[in-house]
Amino acid sequence: MTAPASLQAKAVGIGMTSQRVRDRLVERLRECGIQDERVLTTIRIVPRHLFIDEALALRAYEDTALPIGHGQTISQPWVVARMTEAVMQVAPKKILEIGTGSGYQSAILASLGLEVYTIERIGKLLRQARKRFRQLGIKIRSKHDDGSIGWTEHAPYNAILVTAAAPTLIDTLIEQLAIGGRLVAPVGTASEQALVQLTRTIDGNITHEILEPVTFVSLLPGMLD
């Protein structure tokens, strides 16, 4: 895995955004069970501080979720790593992300060499994310739409990653998953959620596995500008 040169240049930080601080975060993730070195290396390289408000930059490499406005958050790095590790186990080439948010998870996936399609229902967040993608030289296909309907034009996907919680897994998204593909999503209520891994096996069957308890914002229908 080789990140774009422009991304590596932008990744240089100082003080609480320095490489030393990022290395500490990566070691914490490793201690907390993240094993895929490709994922850890990508988290070390991708500059999380550029995906949040400048006022929060000093907290960028804490292992915690942070607000990005509009009632949304940039996910905790451990959660990003865990979800990414889960989808990477099926060696995907093309992935659909539901909920672009800040664009950080999208950037992680693209920097791993995946062909990324991402959908965001809040127009302002998507415009900000697109600007970051351009600045970092990352190629990501994005769409302003209701994420719960997926993106059928480019289906099927080897992996689907959902970054907001619904009460159940969404059939429309499962239908867009390729044979041998994997969907990872938080499922549950506002007070109780779990990260669920769904795999469509080679013979076409569906298997489910509960990975971890998590807390995500709710997956909402419709679109906002």
UniProtKB/Swiss-Prot annotation:
Swiss-Prot/TrEMBL keywords: Cytoplasm, Methyltransferase, S-adenosyl-L-methionine, Transferase
Subcellular location: Cytoplasm
SUPFAM superfamilies: S-adenosyl-L-methionine-dependent methyltransferases (SSF53335)
BP-aspect Gene Ontology terms: methylation; protein modification process; protein repair
Active site, renumbered: 75
Enzyme class name: transferase
Source domain of life: Bacteria
Protein name: Protein-L-isoaspartate O-methyltransferase
Catalysed reactions, semicolon-separated: [protein]-L-isoaspartate + S-adenosyl-L-methionine = [protein]-L-isoaspartate alpha-methyl ester + S-adenosyl-L-homocysteine
Function: Catalyzes the methyl esterification of L-isoaspartyl residues in peptides and proteins that result from spontaneous decomposition of normal L-aspartyl and L-asparaginyl residues. It plays a role in the repair and/or degradation of damaged proteins.
Gene Ontology molecular function, alphabetical: protein-L-isoaspartate (D-aspartate) O-methyltransferase activity
EC number: 2.1.1.77
Organism: Xylella fastidiosa (strain 9a5c)
